[in-house]
Amino acid sequence: MADKSTEVEKAIDPIIDLGNLLFIDREPLQGDAEEGLEERARKNTQLLFNNIWQLEQKRVEEAIIVTLPAATYRLPREKKLPEKKEPTKWEKYAKEKGIEKRKKDKKVFDEATKEWKPTYGYRRGNDNTKDWLIEIPDNAEDPNKDFFAERREKKKERVAKNEMQRMKNLARQMKTTVKTGPSTDKMIGVGIDAKDKSKQDVRFAVDRAKLATASAGKFQEGLKGEKANIKTGKKRKFESNEAPVSAEKERALQILQRMKSKKAKIVEEKASAVAGPLREKKEKQEKKGAKEATRQKSQIHRQQWFKNKVDSKKKGTGGAKKKGANKRK
């Protein structure tokens, strides 16, 4: 197999993010995709490595390494990237004085057993805590005291001092890493501002927050007048296609009984909207009826007055005729 060239040319410039080692090929596929995918993958990988070797290089223990630049794509992740730790008090002092850390051997020769043993840890070499005899120094203030107990106490003091220094370093780092005030981090993911969300978007967000509990919202208490969850995540359960006739008949009877027992629901807004013009029409009819009633009453009184007038005239003419007749006789 002939060696292939390391020089790669692209008709359309790809998107390269060296911080994430990301390469996006924007050229469209032509022809059979399966045949060209392998060659395209090789060229894209070669072009990515060509860009990597253009960065600043340095040699560390017979290996060449490069420092990747900052990533341009912000990928979502569970936890944020670890920040550079604040140097401890000793590290600052060593840097100022030029003290370099020496690499110690992992094994040490034990003079007592004439063997190579670990420098630190279990069964380490030259372990003075295993001595059965301690030589009393010449300048000892009290030669009769317990030197074994004194050694144990000094070790406890050293451990406590190291722990105190470790806690101080952590507190010093916390002061520099803890941010105060509003967050200045960029939002991860594509979305809209909370103020621009619709009522339905807010509702979905509330439902998702309710389910984000250890029991998946099963024991979450609801507020008074709160609506039920829109998406419960439960699958619909359908009845069997083959069911006995008695069960279907009983279900139909239950529906009829429920329809009979329920009262008609009246929507106040619709009822007031419909009843408004009807009420006005009824009031107009009542006013008109009252006027007609008074008019009819006056007509009746007028008819009665005329009737009484006619009757009185008839009575008067009849009495005069009778008197004249009597005179003639």
Curated annotation (Swiss-Prot):
Basic and acidic residues bias spans: 278-295
Ranges of Basic residues composition bias in the record: 320-329
Keyword tags: Nucleus, Ribosome biogenesis
Keyword Plastid: no
Subcellular location: Nucleus, Nucleolus
GO biological process assignments: endonucleolytic cleavage in ITS1 to separate SSU-rRNA from 5.8S rRNA and LSU-rRNA from tricistronic rRNA transcript (SSU-rRNA, 5.8S rRNA, LSU-rRNA); ribosomal large subunit assembly; ribosomal large subunit biogenesis
Cross-referenced Pfam families: RRS1
Gene Ontology CC terms: nucleolus; preribosome, large subunit precursor
Region of interest (Disordered), residue spans: 227-248, 262-329
Family, per entry: Belongs to the RRS1 family.
Role played: Involved in ribosomal large subunit assembly.
Name assigned to this protein: Ribosome biogenesis regulatory protein homolog
Species per Swiss-Prot/TrEMBL record: Caenorhabditis briggsae
Gene that produces this protein: rrbs-1
